[in-house]
A protein has these predicted regions:
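Alpha-helical transmembrane segments of multi-pass membrane proteins
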Residues: 36, 53-61, 86, 95, ...
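Hydrophobic alpha-helical transmembrane segments
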Residues: 25-30, 50-54, 109, 113-117, ...
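Interfacial segments of multi-pass membrane proteins
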Residues: 30-42, 91-95, 138
């Protein structure tokens, strides 16, 4: 039962089987919209969202590890929880450090859109050290950490232009 839950968790249920192309992109877009809704419409505090994301990060590691035996590849495209984790990084850091500026929902959505675009660029191009992690670590750590690095690259890139 727990293995089935882990499988559904790491594939974000609907993206594992329903979406056949661009799973990572769809999962990243889902993440942006999900976080936007819970922060700007449901008004869940950034502290609570941060704790939730940390729990998801930790659980993702164990869920991916237990689910990998169900796949032939070492980094299967069906696993998209890593995109969720990586895409969450720039969003939650933005909210932690800039959330007090009272952005309108429209302004926040525009900013989140840039996070989405940049995350997909860094996740796709895999600049160093993302490419190194992606090639060197064909395991749970590699699956998660390359997307974490892509999220960090988004933060670094936008920090340079002072968003």
């Amino acid at each position: 039962m727990i293995n089935k839950f882990n499988y559904y968790f790491v594939t974000l249920l609907i993206f594992g089987n329903s979406v056949q192309k661009y799973r990572g992109t769809w999962a990243s877009l889902f993440t942006v919209l999900f976080l936007f809704i819970i922060i700007y419409f449901l008004k869940i505090s950034v502290f609570v969202v941060t704790i939730l994301l940390l729990i998801i990060l930790v659980y993702s590691y164990f869920a991916i590890a237990s689910s990998l035996k169900n796949f032939k590849e070492s980094d299967p495209q069906e696993i998209v929880i890593d995109e969720f984790v990586g895409q969450s990084i720039p969003i939650i850091l933005f909210e932690i450090f800039h959330g007090d500026r009272n952005y309108s929902a429209y302004e926040a959505l525009q900013i989140y859109f840039w996070f989405f675009l940049l995350f997909r660029v860094f996740d796709g191009l895999k600049p160093f050290p993302i490419d190194y992690v992606d090639k060197k670590f064909k395991n749970t750590f590699g699956i998660l950490f390359d997307d974490i690095l892509a999220g960090i690259y988004v933060v670094l890139c936008l920090s340079l232009i002072h968003i």
